[in-house]
């Protein structure tokens, strides 16, 4: 992705994530207007999942997922993170691996970033480690399709059974 603008990198990540979700047999919806915190909606039937797409960098054995956005104001930069009122999940795409990873908002809300480990740490730390494979898009969607509970089904506005039945 060398030489691409940030917008082009974001568009490439969205396209790769959209393709991966469609290959899993799901429908992807795109908002007609800009300005929302989510990039895509994944139809899990009957639930809708608001997804923020991210391009991730690999540094050694770690995927670094940035979860903070910034904008410049007259008073300086303003940094914001994501919440369950805005999105239901972050899907991070790694062009180096050509794979996507789904992170429920319950695990990343308010955070500046998350590291997903691809290989064990050199210091053998295992406590608090997020293994990338545990968050693979295929595995996470498979759990959701099999009716297994996951934190992301209990978070966010569109995942509320009351709101789904009222649509």
Regions found by a protein language model. Give the residues of each.
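Catalytic cores of nucleic-acid endonucleases
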Residues: 54-100
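Conserved catalytic cores of phosphodiester-cleaving nucleases, focusing on short active-site segments
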Residues: 17, 21, 40-42, 47-57, ...
């Amino acid at each position: 992705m060398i030489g691409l603008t940030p917008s082009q990198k974001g568009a490439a990540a969205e396209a790769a994530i959209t393709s991966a979700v469609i290959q899993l047999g799901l429908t992807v919806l795109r908002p007609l207007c800009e300005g929302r915190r989510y990039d895509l909606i994944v139809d899990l039937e009957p639930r809708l999942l608001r997804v923020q797409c991210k391009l991730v960098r690999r540094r050694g054995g770690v995927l670094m997922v940035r979860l903070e956005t910034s904008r410049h104001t007259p008073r300086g930069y303003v940094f914001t993170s994501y919440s369950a009122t805005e999105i239901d999940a972050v899907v991070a795409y790694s062009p180096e691996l050509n794979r996507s990873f789904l992170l429920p908002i319950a695990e990343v809300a308010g955070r500046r970033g998350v590291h997903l480990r691809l290989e064990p740490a050199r210091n053998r730390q295992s406590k608090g480690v997020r293994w990338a494979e545990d968050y693979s898009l295929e595995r996470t969607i498979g759990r959701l399709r099999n009716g297994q509970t996951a934190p992301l089904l209990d978070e966010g506005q569109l995942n509320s059974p009351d709101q789904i039945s009222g649509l």
